[in-house]
């Protein structure tokens, strides 16, 4: 039996050197499907299951769902800033502190699921209009001190989505919920 890394069930993110138009198109399609896959992973869970951490010391399923909404809202804004400003410095946020706010710990996930559905609809509509040149635009991340291109950010957020959905589905598998 293969052991799953509970922190990184799909492995760590590895940026690509070059990204083809076909790869970007595939990622956009995947990003569009994320809200439905997340909803499918959590829609039949009880409150007790939603409040179960995906690993010791990890977030609960509920916190993961709300984190995805928080994170992807920030990413969408970063894309818009990068398209309208010259290499903007983004404002990082403390995702751990956000996950400890009461709404992240207690709110019904349905609000974040609905938000993600609409957000990903807008985000992918925007992404489908971008030229290769626009995908080369980027933002400066002061924590990593790097410029992140939009095409690499797209790949990162596809990975981020799969990463957290895998936290949930792997927990469900281990607990015998699915």
From Swiss-Prot:
GO terms for molecular function: hydrolase activity; zinc ion binding. It is found in: Cytoplasm. Its main location: cytoplasm. Its EC number is 3.-.-.-. GO terms for cellular component: cytoplasm. Keywords: Cytoplasm, Hydrolase, Metal-binding, Nickel, Zinc. Binds 1 zinc ion per subunit. Is able to bind nickel instead of zinc. Zn(2+) binds at residues 67, 160, 164. InterPro entries: DinB-like (IPR024775), DinB/YfiT-like (IPR034660), Put_metal_dep_hydrolase_YfiT (IPR023774). Its cofactor is Zn(2+); Ni(2+). Possible metal-dependent hydrolase. Homodimer. Belongs to the metal hydrolase YfiT family. This is Putative metal-dependent hydrolase YfiT.
